[in-house]
Amino acid sequence: MHPRFQTAFAQLADNLQSALAPILAGHHFPAMLTAEQVSTLKNTAGLDEDALAFALLPLAAACARTDLSHFNVGAIARGVSGNWYFGANMEFLGATMQQTVHAEQSAISHAWLRGEKGLAAVTVNYTPCGHCRQFMNELNSGLDLRIHLPGRAPHTLRDYLPDAFGPKDLEIKTLLMDEQDHGFTLTGDTLTQAAITAANKSHMPYSHSPSGVALECKDGRIFTGSYAENAAFNPTLPPLQGALNLLSLNGYDYADIQRAILAEKGDAALIQWDATAATLKALGCHNIDRVLLG
């Protein structure tokens, strides 16, 4: 078990501990539960779906990287597939505050990058900020997405974001988590192809500036992130943050990164290179390359 989980794990009920122990074994638990695992945990612990999600929230929050605020937020995105995806907030010392990943963004991008097609609910241990409410409004689940908070009745995103502005106001039909493939040809080595594949998945209906990042760890593991734009622009999630989020959730550290590649168009309206390189260098990675999409 990764050390970050030990305190939260020790506070769980005994029957839930017994069921979770084999799942959490090893240093690189993927911070997700399959539908089958969720069903097993519910039956073993005698909890319904909502109660189980609340019980597991401390494990999600334990994944937070909060060197600046020391305020850990955890979230669990519940996919329509039945799979659950952990998320937690991330802050990057030496970068800028704008590079921060919020817990809801973390869980949602985690689900998206693992191929989830839609979300039924998000469980989070603190009220979503306005930034995250706007980010969630880009999803194909729309304002019907259920939000669950401790000590409160569940509400929909519509309740938390009245009179919402979103992609439909801009006549955008393809939403975040809808299937997208922009068709750029895969070239280069494995890591380069992974970055291009991530760029092909980008949600970028506002700038038409696709981008993807691939990070290679010293043990050969590769994590990718795809660009996810938002109708309100500022809640947009850059591709590097998506990749760093997956890397961290899987129990890796920034020091494990040995190489990074950004794939983007050289003549795009928005360019990720400078911000991507600056953030990676702040985290200690200097082996950074760029491949241009054509």
Swiss-Prot record:
CDD domains: cytidine_deaminase (cd01283). Pfam families: dCMP_cyt_deam_1, dCMP_cyt_deam_2. InterPro entries: APOBEC/CMP_deaminase_Zn-bd, CMP_dCMP_dom, Cyd/dCyd_deaminase_Zn-bd, Cyt/Deoxycyt_deaminase, Cyt_deam_dimer, Cytidine_deaminase-like, Cytidine_deaminase_bacteria. Keywords: Hydrolase, Metal-binding, Zinc. Its cofactor is Zn(2+). Zn(2+) binds at residues 102, 129, 132. The keyword Zinc applies. Substrate binds at residues 89-91. GO terms for cellular component: cytosol. Residues 48-168, 186-294 form the CMP/dCMP-type deaminase domain. It is an enzyme of class 3 (hydrolase). Its EC number is 3.5.4.5. It catalyses: cytidine + H2O + H(+) = uridine + NH4(+); 2'-deoxycytidine + H2O + H(+) = 2'-deoxyuridine + NH4(+). One of its GO terms (biological process) is cytidine deamination. Binds 1 zinc ion. GO terms for molecular function: cytidine deaminase activity; identical protein binding; zinc ion binding. The active site is at residue 104. The keyword Transport does not apply. This enzyme scavenges exogenous and endogenous cytidine and 2'-deoxycytidine for UMP synthesis. Belongs to the cytidine and deoxycytidylate deaminase family. Homodimer. This is Cytidine deaminase. It comes from Salmonella choleraesuis (strain SC-B67).
